Regions:
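Transmembrane signal-anchor hairpin modules in multi-pass inner-membrane enzymes, especially those
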Residues: 1-87, 107-113, 117, 176-186, ...
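Long extracytoplasmic/lumenal interhelical loops at the membrane interface
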Residues: 278-345
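Alpha-helical transmembrane segments of multi-pass inner-membrane proteins
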Residues: 23-24, 113-144, 154-226, 236, ...
Length: 416
């Protein structure tokens, strides 16, 4: 017993860092155990703080994330939320706990490389599991194309969240200029193609749009920030073009883009008529436009927000008034995190949320941090199409990686 305690004391930082590395891979594969994994990290952090192995060093982004949780907590009291709203607060707890943990995290280059590797490994395992599930589905139902797409393919995480995980892996692999994360070049190419081409199976509109934006923006930033990397830019464009060409070879995806553009055009011409004339069953893009319209009205009616846990009631009321009782029964969220936060916490909450994004974009630009910039851009794009911090998958992924990457500084930042 004494030997074990002595060993833990002498090797605390090794145990601590390896626990974070294990967390970054295990929560992806076993999301139901993410709470237990976080509790273990909390216990380690408390132990390290007591023994003065760790020091509390939050930055503006981490404090703002914790403040966002505080705003959600406060809204329960200011808007007289029901006790059932506590379950929504439980989902938001990661907004407090993860930034708090990372505020103690002694970010070092070596350990961060291992975190990146662990995330990539987790994504590869998820891809393997997804193909296994799809294969079993095709054996049972014989519908091979349907079985290998969207929710049939991604059964552990929602396809949009899985898409975000994979794009982050693609970015990490391709922007590893020093070749330290994945030293083997052929393996880097395989990992890049694997994490990129699976986007076809996921069918996430936000994911496709993000890939296009990254193709347009990142090579320019590489030229501005680093210079002299023509081969990197060329290979990046070629590989991504191959990936996008493969993605758009699907008639289903091209039809999805076409329908989305058509719906947006009709909606802009006359929003009220568009909503009234929708017939069931609704397509996904139709549903989004209706939900955005309704939730925006709630934001304007309640500039201070309706509070955490109360939005479903207000959404249902507005949808029923528009003749969409069937949609109201589904209790969908707004499918837009910016609108969701404004509806729940008011415009003050939106400003707090935007402050996190703006701060991270500023430090990414000033410190020439391409991976952080790409992750923030990913967060913005996905938040435009999904309420990304409503589920644990989105909260943990973005909170963890935005928090970790925000802890870099010019002295110990990873050379990317």
């Amino acid at each position: 017993m004494l030997f074990t305690i002595s060993y833990c004391m002498d090797n605390f930082l090794k145990i601590y860092h390896r626990s974070f590395v294990l967390f970054s891979v295990l929560w992806l594969i076993f999301p139901k155990f993410s709470s237990l994994l976080i509790i273990w990290l909390c216990l380690l952090t408390i132990f390290g703080a007591i023994k003065k192995q760790l020091v509390f060093k939050p930055n503006i982004a981490l404090l703002a994330m914790m403040a966002l949780f505080g705003a959600y907590l406060l809204s329960l009291f200011t808007h007289a939320a029901a006790l059932s709203s506590l379950r929504f607060l439980e989902n938001k707890l990661s907004l407090l706990v993860i930034p708090m943990l990372i505020s103690f995290y002694p970010a070092k280059q070596k350990e961060l490389i291992h975190l990146f590797r662990a995330h990539i490994l987790g994504c590869i395992v998820l891809i393997s599991i997804a193909f296994y599930h799809s294969y079993k589905c095709s054996l049972a139902f014989g519908e091979s194309l349907r079985c290998f797409s969207t929710t049939n393919f991604s059964q552990i995480h929602h396809p949009s969240y899985f898409s975000a995980f994979l794009i982050f892996s693609s970015v990490v692999v391709i922007l590893d200029k020093s070749n330290t994360i994945v030293p083997n070049k052929p393996l880097r190419i395989i990992l890049f193609l694997a994490t990129l081409l699976v986007q076809w199976n996921l069918g996430s509109l936000a994911g496709f749009l993000l890939i296009i934006l990254l193709v347009l923006i990142v090579p320019v930033l590489i030229s501005v920030f680093q210079g002299g990397v023509k081969n990197l830019i060329l290979s990046y464009i070629i590989l991504t073009t191959i990936g996008i060409g493969f993605i758009f070879s699907s008639e289903e995806i091209k039809a999805d883009f076409s329908n989305a553009l058509s719906f947006v055009k009709n909606y802009n011409e006359n929003p009220e008529e568009f909503i009234r004339n929708r017939t069931y069953p609704l397509e996904g893009n139709e549903t989004r436009l209706i939900l955005w319209n309704v939730s925006t009205k709630i934001c304007l009616k309640h500039p201070l927000g309706v509070g955490l846990g109360n939005l479903d009631f207000h959404m249902q009321k507005e949808l029923e008034a528009l003749g969409h009782s069937r949609l109201a029964l589904k209790q969908n969220n707004p499918h837009n995190q910016f609108i969701q936060i404004t509806a729940e916490l008011g415009f003050i909450g939106l400003l707090l949320f935007l402050s996190i994004i703006i701060y991270l974009l500023v430090i990414a630009s000033k410190q020439k941090r391409l991976i952080l910039f790409s992750l923030v851009l990913s967060f913005i794009v996905f938040c435009l199409f999904e309420s990304m911090i409503q589920r644990q998958s989105g909260i943990i992924f973005f909170c963890f990686w935005l928090a970790v990457l925000s802890r870099f500084n010019e002295k110990n930042r990873f050379a990317l």
